[in-house]
Amino acid sequence: MSLKWTSVFLLIQLSCYFSSGSCGKVLVWPTEYSHWINMKTILEELVQRGHEVTVLTSSASTLVNASKSSAIKLEVYPTSLTKNYLEDSLLKILDRWIYGVSKNTFWSYFSQLQELCWEYYDYSNKLCKDAVLNKKLMMKLQESKFDVILADALNPCGELLAELFNIPFLYSLRFSVGYTFEKNGGGFLFPPSYVPVVMSELSDQMIFMERIKNMIHMLYFDFWFQIYDLKKWDQFYSEVLGRPTTLFETMGKAEMWLIRTYWDFEFPRPFLPNVDFVGGLHCKPAKPLPKEMEEFVQSSGENGIVVFSLGSMISNMSEESANMIASALAQIPQKVLWRFDGKKPNTLGSNTRLYKWLPQNDLLGHPKTKAFITHGGTNGIYEAIYHGIPMVGIPLFADQHDNIAHMKAKGAALSVDIRTMSSRDLLNALKSVINDPVYKENVMKLSRIHHDQPMKPLDRAVFWIEFVMRHKGAKHLRVAAHNLTWIQYHSLDVIAFLLACVATVIFIITKFCLFCFRKLAKKGKKKKRD
């Protein structure tokens, strides 16, 4: 750690000692890539407020860099997985998800998706075991006496560490496939009549056939789809804790769920007291652009610019796709800044410049920006909402199709399919978004909603972490549903009892009526004989 950061860290610690004793120690179980961007924003704010933050990460981590100086502590544990192997494996999974998973039928798509999820969670399971079964590491962390754990729910293990150390924990999450973690671990409510199942690409305004589709999705995810090998994870948790338990039961002990969306993005739905929405917490005002980039932007004149990025995980694409996209971009009057790390397309127009990296937030906040071509990652969408920029979505994998579906439903975006789109499809979508004022009006409405909050998303996220530290948890916000079985939660036992009571009463009345009828019949026969 550099002398500068050492001094900063010591000053923070001293301020903590001389303050009212509100500084705490936070242990973090992160997830890579865009998830880390959100998590890091929260952690940096916690450090600014005087808290001691330690990130537990493996030696194979691709983004959490232990060599960079930072006030955030890194506790790196060894794993048999190498950084290159893990990164290559994850990129192969993504490549198969984008180009290999067939969408021809519902069953084939989600069956292939389940295989990819199992592959991913096999790596997660390995990393969790390497951490938890490292006795030296566990002893060191136990002696550190952390006050709280902040974990990304997408990567299980943070809740297991919290159980081992007997400390409260919070989750950060966008979503899990089929809302598996939210439903089974958090007890979230998703009425299928008006809440679209994630990845169904539906809105909350569903016609009858769409509600049927939504119900089929829900039943499939609830009773058939398994996001990971349940037995493997449940057995591992039971062995480590020394008692029968499940991953979902352990997840259910989370004090708070910090969901990385907000009502500018989400469709209205019920949620629990220990859930808060902190979407866009990483967004901030735009900074000045580098000189060369600013000159290029200014050269666009009244036509303005288009920002194009498919995110940090997709830096390359096929030559055919690149040429098709470049051909479309060459036909618009706007200047285009394209984040691209592949071979220069032959059809690249003079209005388009390629960059290996873009200051995306600063470009989206520039007054000359007219549109944003995006893969639909939550972070990028929130930057577009924050700055009020209409979008053309080219969703690739994970939540991106669903994210773009939300923006389309709110009238702030159009989408094209990377597998089937032509140059004309992209060109028409771009022209519509740029020239039709309704898209700008709709995204500005979302932007105003986003900015009109009683507390900024980042402040709200940090508040709940500090709240849990101050009160040693937030049990008063945890619904009793976590203590009920599936049968009790759905009141099936009560319904069965009431039905049994009704059936008993009907049975008794029927028997009584039959008894009376027989008596009367006997008397009638007796009178006839007499």
UniProtKB/Swiss-Prot annotation:
First-level EC class: transferase
Subcellular location per the Swiss-Prot or TrEMBL entry: Endoplasmic reticulum membrane
GO BP terms in the entry: estrogen metabolic process; steroid metabolic process; xenobiotic metabolic process
Membership in a protein family: Belongs to the UDP-glycosyltransferase family.
Glycosylation site residues: N65, N316, N483
Transmembrane spans: 495-515
Free-text tissue specificity from the UniProt record: Expressed in many tissues. Present in liver, prostate and testis.
Native source species: Homo sapiens (Human)
Coiled coil: none
Name of the protein this chain belongs to: UDP-glucuronosyltransferase 2B15
One example GO MF annotation: glucuronosyltransferase activity
Signal peptide: 1-23
Endoplasmic reticulum among keywords: yes
CDD domains: GT1_Gtf-like
Keyword Lipid metabolism tagged: yes
Domain of life: Eukaryota
Enzyme Commission number: 2.4.1.17
Membrane topology: Single-pass membrane protein
Residues recorded with modification N6-succinyllysine: K136
Known function: UDP-glucuronosyltransferase (UGT) that catalyzes phase II biotransformation reactions in which lipophilic substrates are conjugated with glucuronic acid to increase the metabolite's water solubility, thereby facilitating excretion into either the urine or bile. Essential for the elimination and detoxification of drugs, xenobiotics and endogenous compounds. Catalyzes the glucuronidation of endogenous steroid hormones such as androgens (testosterone, androsterone) and estrogens (estradiol, epiestradiol, estriol, catechol estrogens).
InterPro entries on file: UDP-glycosyltransferase (IPR050271), UDP_glucos_trans (IPR002213), UDP_glycos_trans_CS (IPR035595)
GO cellular component terms, semicolon-separated: endoplasmic reticulum membrane
